[in-house]
Regions:
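TRAFAC-class small GTPase G-domain
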Residues: 1-172
């Protein structure tokens, strides 16, 4: 960052079904840590991480929104002022991909098109993986950024947030 250049701040929301790993992904990204203990997010939890993109630096304000499998109960008001979002699905539970797809439709209807990345989390559990490559390929063909991730090992986490940081700071 050059002297006198203002620090960019961008609000990023974490969205996905119940128990897909949103909080663990944030913890991995912000603290480079993972905990086996499961804690349910109530409402929203906010964290911050500074990302150096070379030509600029951005503070990502991460809003970890409580996961719901019934998307009608997800509070879209949390997304006000959001520059982009991370959709999270659990690769061992295909129904959570359906929740993520529905959440994206709802976000677009309520807030317009925003940059996003879809993380298929729990990639370390390959023997239990249940989302087919055809579904993933179809989403990529539709222009989606789809990445495998593991909050436990850190696989794909940093790259996904960095990609989103680049996209939300790009000139519109």
């Amino acid at each position: 960052m050059t002297a006198g250049q203002p620090m960019l701040q961008k609000k990023i929301c974490m969205l996905g079904g119940f128990s897909v790993g949103k909080t663990s992904l944030v913890k991995r990204f912000v603290e480079s840590a993972f905990s086996e203990a499961y804690l349910t997010t109530v409402g929203v939890k906010i964290d911050k991480k500074t990302v150096d993109l070379g030509e600029r630096t951005v503070n990502l304000i991460l809003w970890d929104v409580a996961g719901e499998d019934d998307i009608s109960t997800v509070r879209m008001t949390y997304l006000r002022g959001c520059a982009g979002y991370v959709l999270v699905a659990d690769g061992t539970r295909p129904s959570t991909l359906g929740v993520a797809l529905s959440l994206r439709e709802r976000v677009e209807a309520d807030h317009g098109r925003l940059p996003f990345v879809l993380l298929l989390n729990k990639n370390d559990l390959q023997e239990q993986w249940a989302i087919g490559t055809t579904e993933i390929d179809d989403l990529r063909q539709a222009g989606w950024s789809v990445r495998a991730s593991s909050a436990r090992t850190g696989e794909g986490v940093e790259d996904a947030f960095r990609e989103l940081a680049v996209r939300v700071t790009a000139p519109q």
